[in-house]
Curated annotation (Swiss-Prot):
Function: Catalyzes the biosynthesis of agmatine from arginine.
Listed Pfam families: Arg_decarb_HB, Arg_decarbox_C, Orn_Arg_deC_N
Gene3D superfamilies cross-referenced by the UniProt entry: 1.10.287.3440, 1.20.58.930, Alanine racemase, Lyase, Ornithine Decarboxylase, Chain A, domain 1
Residues found modified as N6-(pyridoxal phosphate)lysine: 127
Cofactor(s) required, per the database record: Mg(2+); pyridoxal 5'-phosphate
Extent of the signal sequence: none
UniProt binding sites for substrate: 307-317
SUPFAM superfamilies in the record: Alanine racemase C-terminal domain-like (SSF50621), PLP-binding barrel (SSF51419)
The protein's Enzyme Commission number: 4.1.1.19
Organism this protein belongs to: Shigella flexneri
Name of the featured protein: Biosynthetic arginine decarboxylase
One example of a Gene Ontology biological process annotation: spermidine biosynthetic process
Any GO molecular function: metal ion binding
Taxon lineage: Bacteria, Pseudomonadati, Pseudomonadota, Gammaproteobacteria, Enterobacterales
Length: 662
């Protein structure tokens, strides 16, 4: 369903009717620049996301058309006023198309620069995000594009869309007879379908079914390399990887095809180093090794025409431009240059033709295009007041804490900040133990905790972030003093990789970014699971365990954006606590400042989620009705309860109350 609508949303302060003096605008620009550095927006945002003069996140889906941008905070508020439920995914199909154009352009420049005569195709692996909006946005971009399938279901989706691309189809993954027949049917229909052999057991079935269908199969071979990347996804490449043939098996495959008279069917060489390759050196090493396979296969009489380097093109989630797990130390041009040069160099050295180069760059195409937006439903601040001095006969631990507090305010003291902090921590530890054994009262425990928070705040004020010796203490205190923000979303459903492999995603408020980030926060979801928390956040050039936050009204906190969740997250999300898919809207931004929004996914209802676990909503409603009727409640109240139960069954799985803040 869609609620296709056009909104003339403003893209600048002037169009909002907000008048500011030149001095105010200049000050906002300075603060915006500081926020860009704090959250590294300039790097992970990749010109798609920025901070405008109002201190709001703005989105420019096509950086080649900079006047086409939208204020995301204003867009969300407008949508809310029109009935949009949160959490919701705000998807920008124009970003998908720009990413595809950018990668294609990088390889075009590389081919021209190195005199490379072969073609290039980006083949989109739909496993990264199989949603129709993604596949069809890419197909309708006007750019050359192939599609990759890794299962029967994916192959059916690919074949159904193949008529719109007339390009390349690559078939990976485990294959049974039905999968293989589907691929061969696609070839018979006139599509260029490459069946990539990843297990020796597949080739006999391929040859058998090709004969049955009277079709010449178009085959590829996935070679298992010794080269391997590093990081969270390294196991998908290298000698121990799940897929691919070892060198001996590659030779066996060649001989099997030669004996069957089908050696000319083997036309594609495929390898995969791993997903999200952080270091360009690892990519270059792997391509050089795979180029040797290309050379050696030609020596064996195999006319390889396509060189599929697989995935690996990473994105900079951190914005640190480094080789850490969630970053990359290279850009699109360097990636394309390394691949084209390595393959071209091997061809020139051995007098071989330049093959068509294929990359399966799904993450790099899709990650940026989706933002999860949600509301904060509760804030727990570490508020404190400095307590008065303890009574004269108070236990020693209380007196010791008070003495440390007084010493912190005496001029000329020689004790270090760390020593003050450690002393107060030891005293508080003793008090907690004493409380458990009955030595300390509840009032005394509360007094000690308030004084400890006061001490932490006092130490925090005297620490210098530029002093490397202070960093461990700063991190410790930021964790201790951070606000707890309860956010209306499920980490397991919307960002499963943040939970499963500790992947970092950019998270920040959508507004208030023209202010100094004076507070720190940790974000907690609404699942009944202590793992439902985000553990790492962007903080300048590093990663922190708390999120920098500008000052905000705890009674009206800002909305939060979870960025770069367009790759894998929607597909991998699980049903923990029966929280379902969120609503999703597609946003189109035009140079005249107008915006069109289409509802692409209504989100799951409670009934939808119950049916997934074989709980029939109608049966549940009947069972609840039977219970209500057995009560001594009056008829009007019974009817009210039944209506509320039924409305809940067909309502959103997330919190919907207008007065949610707790």
């Amino acid at each position: 369903m869609s609620d296709d609508m056009s909104m003339g949303l403003p893209s600048s302060a002037g169009e909002h009717g907000v008048l500011r003096s030149m001095q105010e605008v200049a000050m906002s620009s300075q603060e915006a620049s500081k926020m860009l550095r704090t959250y590294n927006i300039a790097w992970w945002g990749n010109n798609y996301y920025d901070v405008n003069e109002l201190g709001h996140i703005s989105v420019c889906p096509d950086p080649d058309v900079p006047e086409a941008r939208v204020d995301l905070a204003q867009l969300v508020k407008t949508r809310e006023a029109q009935g949009q439920r949160l959490p919701a995914l705000f998807c920008f199909p124009q970003i998908l198309q720009h990413r595809l154009r950018s990668i294609n352009a990088a390889f075009k420049r590389a081919r021209e620069s190195y005199g490379y005569n072969g073609d290039y195709f980006l083949v989109y692996p739909i496993k990264v995000n199989q949603h129709r909006r993604v596949i069809e946005s890419l197909i309708h971009s006007g750019e050359p594009l192939g599609l990759e399938a890794g299962s029967k279901a994916e192959l059916m989706a690919v074949l159904a869309h193949a008529g719109m691309t007339r390009s390349v189809i690559v078939c990976n993954g485990y294959k049974d007879r039905e999968y293989i027949r589907l691929a061969l049917i696609g070839e018979k229909m006139g599509h260029k379908v490459y069946l990539v052999i990843e297990k020796m057991s597949e080739i006999a079935i391929v040859l058998d079914e090709a004969e049955r269908l009277n079709v010449v199969p178009r085959l590829g071979v996935r070679a298992r390399l010794a080269s391997q990347g590093s990081g969270k996804w390294q196991s998908s490449g290298g000698e121990k990887s799940k897929f691919g043939l070892a060198a001996t098996q590659v030779l066996q495959l060649v001989e099997t095809l030669r004996e069957a008279g089908r050696l000319d069917s083997l036309q594609l060489l495929h390898f995969h180093l791993g997903s999200q390759m952080a270091n360009i050196r690892d990519i270059a090493t792997g391509v050089r090794e795979s180029a040797r396979f290309y050379v050696e296969l030609h020596k064996l009489g195999v006319n390889i025409q396509c060189f599929d380097v697989g995935g690996g093109l990473g994105v900079d989630y951190e914005g640190t431009r480094s080789q850490s797990d969630c970053s990359v130390n290279y850009g699109l041009n360097e990636y394309a240059n390394n691949i084209i040069w390595a393959i071209g160099d091997a061809c020139e050295e051995n007098g071989l033709p330049h093959p068509t180069v294929i990359t399966e760059s799904g993450r790099a195409v899709t990650a940026h295009h989706t933002v999860l937006v949600s509301n904060i439903i509760g804030v727990e601040r570490n508020e404190y007041t400095v307590p008065t001095a303890p009574v004269e006969d108070a236990p020693r631990a209380l007196q010791s804490m008070w003495e440390t507090w007084q010493e912190m305010h005496e001029p000329g003291t020689r004790r270090s900040l760390r020593e003050w902090l450690h002393d107060s921590q030891m005293d508080l530890h003793d008090i907690h133990i004493g409380y458990s054994s009955g030595t300390f009262s509840l009032q005394e425990r509360a007094w000690a905790e308030q004084l400890y928070l006061s001490m932490c705040h006092e130490v925090q004020k005297q620490l210098d972030p530029q002093n490397r010796a202070h960093r461990p203490i700063i991190d410790e205190l930021q964790e201790r003093m951070a606000d707890k923000m309860y956010v209306n979303f499920s980490l397991f459903q919307s960002m499963p990789d943040a939970w499963g492999i500790d992947q970092l995603f950019p998270v920040l408020p959508l507004e208030g970014l023209d202010q100094v980030p004076e507070r720190r926060a940790v974000l907690l979801d609404i699942t009944c699971d202590s793992d439902g928390a985000i553990d790492h956040y962007i903080d300048g050039d590093g990663i922190a365990t708390t999120m920098p936050m500008p000052e905000y009204d705890p009674e009206n906190p800002p909305m939060l954006g979870f960025f770069m969740v367009g790759a894998y997250q929607e597909i991998l999300g699980n049903m923990h606590n029966l929280f379902g898919d969120t609503e999703a809207v597609d946003v189109f931004v035009f140079p005249d400042g107008s915006v069109e929004v289409e509802l692409s996914d209504e989100g799951d209802t409670v009934a939808d989620m119950l049916q997934y676990v074989q709980l029939d909503p109608k049966t549940l409603l009947t069972q609840f009705r039977d219970q209500v009727k057995k009560t001594d409640l009056d008829a009007e109240l019974q009817q009210q309860f039944l209506e509320e139960f039924e409305a809940g069954l067909y309502g959103y799985t997330y919190l919907e109350d207008e007065n949610l803040l707790i």
